[in-house]
From Swiss-Prot:
The gene is avrA. This is Avirulence protein A. Keywords: Virulence. Residues 1-11, 124-136 have a biased composition (Polar residues). Residues 1-47, 116-157 are annotated as: Disordered. It comes from Pseudomonas savastanoi pv. glycinea (Pseudomonas syringae pv. glycinea).
Amino acid sequence: MWNVSKSSNNLGAYKLPLEAQTPPEKISPFDAMSAAQPEGKAPHDQLQNDQYPIQQAEDRGRHLVEQAEIQAHVQHCHSKAPEIGDATKTQSVSEKLGTAKNSSCDASQILIGSKNDDFHKNKAGSNGDINKSSDPSALRCSLSPAPRRVPKSKKSYGAATIGGKVYHPHEKTDSTIADFLSRSLSNNAYRSERHLRKRALAYLNHISAEKEITSNACFAMKDVNSFAHKQSEWLCHLERSLWRDEPALQFHDRQQLGNEVLGLKKPDDQSPYFKPRAWKISDEAASAFAMMLKGESGPFTQDQVKVGFEICQEGELLAGRLKIQPRMAFRLKNRHDANRSGTHSVKSLSGLDLSADVGTDIREFFQVPVMSGTSGTSSDVVIAARYAAMHAGLKWSAPELTIDQAKHALIDLSMDFFRRNGPAVVMALRMNSLRKNQGLPYKEVDRCEVFTHSYAEIHGAISLTIDGVDPADKVEVKNRLYGYTLDAKATLMKIADRSIRRGVRSKVDIRSTSTSLQTPQLRRVLEKKKIVQKVAELYSEMGKAGNSATLKEAITKSSVKELLVNDKPVVSRDYALGEPLMVRSLRFSHDHEATSSFGSAGKTPAKREVDTLCDNSTAFDIVMTPFSVINAKAKGDTISEMKVPHRPKWKGLPSVLYKVTASVDLPEYAVARPGFGDIHSFNSNKAFSSEFSSVRNSLSHAEKMGFIENSLKPYIKHDPDRESFDFKHSIDELADAQCMLQSRKPNSTLRHNEYCAKLELWDAKAIEVGMSRPVAVATLIEFNLEMLSAARYIEDEGYDGKLITNFLERQLSWFGQNAALNKEVTLKKLWGLPFDERKAVAEKVCEALRQGVSLCVYEKNVEGSRIRELSLLNFNAYDIMRGIELFLSSKLLQPPTGAGPTVKSRL
């Protein structure tokens, strides 16, 4: 995306004074905003004619740094009592900034664009010749004091725009968003706060792995035997082969052009370098490219062979300015870039807009970091290598490397270039200039956290170009990016896992280290813990309420209101219209737990139900979740209402009502819950025999259900009024049979029936209160908390995560309502599922999870039964308080008190 060149000794760009920054209105647009450039215009041609702004700033910054370094040295050597706050006591300014060439990898904590007011205040006094006097006091008089540490200012955040307006974090902002915006420097547009959080979490989950990739790439360039070093050197030789006999140079003085690249000669109006650059080419790249233009065939130096990536960019630039048509046409035909809708992070006050970019869509799907979209510059370098190799009759990959090794070497070179060198410096400078007009303060961040390109964006661009995918074939590009992004995510996950197992302990920044070691799972646990803390705070506030009105006001104003109040009467309406519902009664782990404390066995009934639905059991393979079917034309008991046998473990507990919501946006298989059942209950647990255990791993979900059904046929209960001695195979069919049985027994309440299928957590719609309203309140809170957590899990892990993948595998194992596909065929269908289809399913699942559950009562009447929706706000104060207390008692280390302090969570 960014066609920028790293600068050796680029001190001014590292810590540039504010007055030297380029105003926003003069910021030159980068070329890569469009997928293809106009004919004859290379990337750098899109920049405006601002004469060497960064080079001038570098000179000024270098002068100020040298002045400050002298001051620091003198004060350190001659001051009798140096102050503790002296920033130069242990490390010089030049050491902080990494003045040595090619030493970026040794300065991982450099802050980009940091400002030091002492540099501006102390410009005078450094012009005198310090060698004229050996008197230390004279020296101290002629020099101003050494720069001191600048006091920390108010925390600044990266620019994020929602609806064209800059988003400002506040005390209620999600910690994930606040952490992301505080540690990174970016200017991107988002659809909503939830969209911002999704991108933020992907960034936080993988930034440590990306930093490790970048660091490894940097160190690889020090090893002449590394793949990256060999490929970089080969790029230099390939590029030189193109310019040795280039016909376009016949009309130009090659010596003059070489000197212009080196900055030794001023370009005339006929020179391709007449139009000034917006940045300075690095000394190593300039010297190497000047050799090529002059036709010199001497060997490259050790420093020159390290900048092959930059040299290829320079070759693309000059080819465009010289209008070398074959090379320009090859670039246009093969270049891959992002669709940024004409926006740019250093130009657009409303932020970089990637909403129309297919690559970004896929990266969000897999929850990997998004920065600026597919890297056009990375694609350019591959194009340059392929074009040169084609003309020279050589391979584009280094002789000793395989294609795969060369590809990963290019990815490393690109990561090192974008995240440690020129692009990070220039982007930080220009985004900070733009921040003035956005009403945001100057911001300093670690260079690796300036938004240039993420690993997946670079990986995708290089892979697409190497594999020769036609940029005009949008379907093929999309399909390939799907696979490339999956590979990139696997790499990031592998590195993160390895880092955690190593137990990385940084000596520099404990805070960033502890944050980097937080896995997505741990981060979700911490988020859940914070929500429990907020419920505890609400409980304390409610304990201070003087009346029910004040208590309800505290609930409605609470940040956890959504966990308690859900007034969407969809269940009662649909039930009255004749749609059957599925019911599962909650239960304790055993009868004794029902008489002891709530959740004393380690899980509450609600958590046990959630874990069953999500197949979180480590001891069992949850193939099915048996339930009862109820409908408005019949009156049947739930399991919690059973009188014989009397089991305290489920007696009077709430029940969960389930309903699969059809949607025109979803394929039929996603809303089907194939299974079998009967009007009478049967011993469904009898199916899990040793025989089933021996074959289950080789069976698809549908095959498992078929095996279970055949095993349970002997347990179908005898009934003289039965039409068939076989199972029903649809919920509607069982509901019809229930109505027929009710018609034969109009005055009787039917015993619960049983249906075996696999319900999902997002099928849950309501909590039937049962005999205890406080228990119902506790169940409501926990169920909604777990559903919210599940939605975040899916969004955090990406739509290829375990929960969605397992669901799709189960659903795709069915062919129609009853036919089963084997495991091999099922997996082929799963991995052949179109990206858009998988995404649509996952988004609908998350939407259903975020809707949560409401409270209701299941009532029987003369005509049958009905569902009556309830609101928590209609409960009395005691039931609400006691219910919240029950919930907290299962989550907290100390029992809560009505007006007591917030206590620690044991989640």
